[in-house]
């Protein structure tokens, strides 16, 4: 076998919980730094981050150079051309936002698989090492991993139907968008959101498909750990950098003020 084995996909089925981190700043150095910290996976955010295709390739290379960390690419939407392009870049695991129905899930899977299992177009791109992996087309389908994001009330209603689609490997809850669609934004609504995410998690786990979440709120992360989630992201590069820079500034401002402004 020449096509790299998707270690993240394999780890979803067995082994410890996979811990990840979000890359929103679109820089390969940040990807390399974070991969070197020991994360199991990093998500390259092509939905909200300022990503370009060459930039995604650079981040993929940075993660690949720092094993055993795996890269996930979140594509901007359901567009089949974008899915094909990102897979051709060498990504093996894709996260797809705003999946609300089984029909959408089936179309995403179809776009990610070579015929006869799907409709992904053939091209001599980086994923096949520009033709250097002659067996790539025959081997690629088994290594592709598709994660459907559950982010709306409609998606929650359809959890079981989405999970039942062959080729959907995992479901990932988006608590921020879910809170927005349910009118649960703000600290005063946290208890209701916590109840909603707990119920959604239990339903995902009951389907037998791995569940995941991103949250900077430790209560939600712990809820998913306790509830059987298989992969969790606990931070975002942009927020982590902003907090570190701000905390350092405030600490020294306070120290200087305590010394009379010296």
UniProtKB/Swiss-Prot annotation:
Residues marked Increases basicity of active site His (site)? 88
What's in the GO CC field?
A: cytoplasm
Q: Which InterPro entries match?
A: Aldolase/citrate-lyase_domain (IPR005000), HpcH-HpaI_aldolase (IPR050251), Pyrv/PenolPyrv_kinase-like_dom (IPR015813), Pyrv_kinase-like_dom_sf (IPR040442)
Which residues of this protein are annotated with the site description Transition state stabilizer? Answer: 74
Q: What does the UniProt keyword field contain?
A: Aromatic hydrocarbons catabolism, Lyase, Magnesium, Metal-binding, Plasmid
Q: Does the keyword Metal-binding apply?
A: yes
**Highest taxon in the source lineage:** Bacteria
Q: Which reaction does it catalyse?
A: (S)-4-hydroxy-2-oxopentanoate = acetaldehyde + pyruvate
Q: In which pathway does it act?
A: Xenobiotic degradation; biphenyl degradation
* Keyword Ribonucleoprotein attributed: no
Q: What class of enzyme is it?
A: lyase
Residues annotated as binding Mg(2+): 151, 177
Sequence positions that bind substrate = 149, 176-177
Sample GO molecular function, one term: 4-hydroxy-2-oxovalerate aldolase activity
SUPFAM superfamilies attached to this UniProt entry: Phosphoenolpyruvate/pyruvate domain
Catalytic residues as annotated in Swiss-Prot or TrEMBL: 48
Query: Could you tell me the EC number(s) of this protein?
Result: 4.1.3.39
Record's Pfam families?
HpcH_HpaI
Q: Name one GO biological process term.
A: catabolic process
Please explain the role this protein plays, according to its UniProt record.
Answer: Catalyzes the reversible retro-aldol cleavage of 4-hydroxy-2-oxovalerate to pyruvate and acetaldehyde.
* Protein family according to the UniProt entry: Belongs to the HpcH/HpaI aldolase family.
List the protein's name.
Answer: 4-hydroxy-2-oxovalerate aldolase
